[in-house]
Swiss-Prot record:
Protein name: CTP synthase
Gene3D superfamilies (UniProt xref): 3.40.50.880, P-loop containing nucleotide triphosphate hydrolases
Phenotype seen when the gene is deleted: Cells lacking this gene require cytidine for growth, proving that in L.lactis, the pyrG product is the only enzyme responsible for the amination of UTP to CTP.
Subunit comment: Homotetramer. In contrast to E.coli CTP synthase, remains a tetramer at dilute enzyme concentrations even in the absence of Mg(2+), ATP and UTP.
Length: 535
């Protein structure tokens, strides 16, 4: 079977939920027995989002092979339950950088390097590479931003050329557009959707399907009007309404025959998607019997997307305990030893996620200290693990001023130090310890029990600093347990305190591998204990 290509674009405005549409369609097609992969095109000039502020971009999602990517890849993985790779996120910066390297090497044989054909050819190559490296039957490529944006023009042109290159039966264009709801007048306006589709047509692409983003349902008459003006079959005008839970969306799209229309267009003979298990999960999620409050102490809490995988992993873990997770967003900058009880005291558990830089670290340390002294279940992630060690060094070992070398190069007690292979690294982007690495678990530890007594777990990392082994013996003598280490025993992966309800921190990012129907084990145990703690 020829590889099938589905392209998801957006018009009218950004943040239309294209990623969720792509992920939901991917789930439906996977449940038809098809092998699906998904890819995100980001037209910005950064090589990747690794050095971008979370306030600009939200979370950086890390793949197994160590690519720092757009947060939409997290949606793809969680919805479809697949592991993506470095070919699943392509930026203008990455493409232009590669083209310029080739030009300097003389690989273009003296040609004038241009947007067409050189940039567009490379973009088409990236699409095909993502499909071939995963042996996918179908690749869904989402283009970030809005059709008509200056920076996205080469991407749209590459998508246009794909139809001629691989055949009309192997390509489908899905355009996501807004329907404006004027609440005061009680009216729905379609002009933005019509103009957005017209703009796409001006670039040579006729949409085969429209996905309408709306707060309220549209009428059949309005659907037919949009279909006529946009030259799309009425049945291929799909509504994506606001929902209570994101995981309802695949079911809503299936109810409108979206996946069948896609299969018919691409001439795919695939059985109907069996969504019974997914439907049961959604029904469970919407009828949780308990509630648990978790304090998330972070420095980017003004933008929840900065912690989207963390919050989703907490929710997934809640599903396993039949509990809705109520997140109390606590700005680490506001936390002190004096007010920490007031800010997190009513939470059944505390999570301290990752981050970079000095700002907010003392607040995180205060929250960790509060959890340790008051036996509140606590989970630390990445920087959260490093600051767990700093807090213990200061307040249990008496090492006044102990810190991470990253945050205080003058500290007398650098309990967190730079990794040996990072000492001479000068570039900031793409040089961290990234991707999947194993952790060997300690017998009898809380971590090993959480991971069902596994000997080794593999989880994704994103860090440059590590626990300083010079202090390991002193920590162990004081009761600090190193419950997960690298197979060569050099890198500390998990730490914990015994005798506590749950006091565990890990260097890796377990949330990146959590799924709604398969929650990550460390998160699951944390929430299970927190639910018990809230009784």
């Amino acid at each position: 079977m020829s590889t099938k290509y589905i392209f998801v674009t957006g018009g009218g405005t950004s943040s239309m939920g294209k990623g969720i549409v792509a992920a939901s369609l991917g789930r439906l097609l996977k449940n038809r027995g098809l092998k699906v992969t998904v890819q995100k095109f980001d037209p910005y000039l950064n090589i990747d989002p690794g050095t971008m502020s979370p306030y600009q971009h939200g979370e950086v999602f890390v793949t197994d092979d160590g690519a720092e990517t757009d947060l939409d890849l997290g949606h793809y993985e969680r919805f479809i339950d697949i592991n993506l790779n470095k070919y699943s996120n392509v930026t203008s910066g990455k493409v232009y950088s590669e083209i310029l390297r080739k030009e300097r090497k003389g690989e273009y044989l003296g040609a004038t390097v241009q947007m067409v054909p050189h940039v567009t050819n490379m973009l088409k190559e990236k699409i095909k590479r993502a499909a071939t490296t995963t042996d996918a039957d179908i690749i869904i490529t989402e283009v970030g931003g809005t059709v008509g944006d200056m920076e996205s023009l080469p991407f749209i042109e590459a998508l246009r050329q794909m139809k001629a290159e691989v055949g009309a039966d192997n390509v489908m264009y899905i355009h996501t557009v807004p329907i404006l709801h004027l609440r005061a007048a009680g009216e729905l306006k379609t002009k933005i959707a019509q103009n957005a589709t017209k703009t796409l047509r001006e670039y040579g692409i006729q949409a085969n399907m429209l996905v309408l983003r709306s707060e309220v349902p549209i009428t059949t008459e309005m659907r037919d009007k949009i279909a006529m003006f946009c030259d799309v079959a009425p049945e291929a005008v799909i509504q994506s309404l606001d929902v209570e839970h994101l995981y309802q969306i695949p079911l809503n799209l299936q109810a409108q025959n979206m996946d069948q229309i896609v299969c018919d267009h691409l001439k795919l003979d695939a059985p109907k998607a069996d969504m019974a298990e997914w439907s049961a999960m959604v029904d469970h999620v919407m009828n949780l019997k308990k509630k648990v409050k978790i304090a998330l102490v972070g420095k980017y809490v003004e933008l929840p997307d900065a912690y989207i995988s963390v919050t989703e992993a907490l929710k997934h873990a809640g599903y396993a305990s039949d509990a809705e997770v109520d997140i109390n967003w606590v700005n680490a900058n506001d936390v002190t030893d004096e007010n920490v009880a007031e800010l997190v005291g009513d939470a059944a558990g505390i999570i301290v996620p990752g981050g970079f830089g000095q700002r907010g670290t003392e607040g995180k340390i205060a929250a960790i200290k509060y959890a340790r002294e008051n036996d509140v279940p606590m989970l630390g992630i990445c920087l959260g693990m490093q600051l767990t060690a700093v807090e213990f060094a200061r307040n249990v070992l008496g090492l006044e001023g102990a810190h991470s070398f990253e945050l205080d190069p003058e500290t007398k007690y650098p309990v967190i130090d730079i990794m040996r292979d990072q000492v001479d690294v000068e570039d900031m982007g793409g040089t961290l310890r990234l991707g999947l690495y194993p952790a060997k678990l300690k017998n009898g530890s809380r971590a090993k029990a959480a991971y069902n007594d596994a000997e080794v777990v593999q989880r994704r990392h994103r860090h440059r600093y590590e626990f300083n082994n010079k202090y390991r013996e002193d920590f162990e003598k004081a009761g600090f347990v190193f419950s997960g280490v690298s197979p060569d025993n050099r890198l500390v992966e998990i730490v914990e305190l015994s005798g506590k309800k749950f006091f565990v921190a890990c260097q890796y990012h377990p949330e990146l591998q959590s799924r709604p129907n398969r929650p990550e084990e460390l998160y699951t145990e944390f929430i299970r204990v927190a639910v018990e703690n809230s009784k």
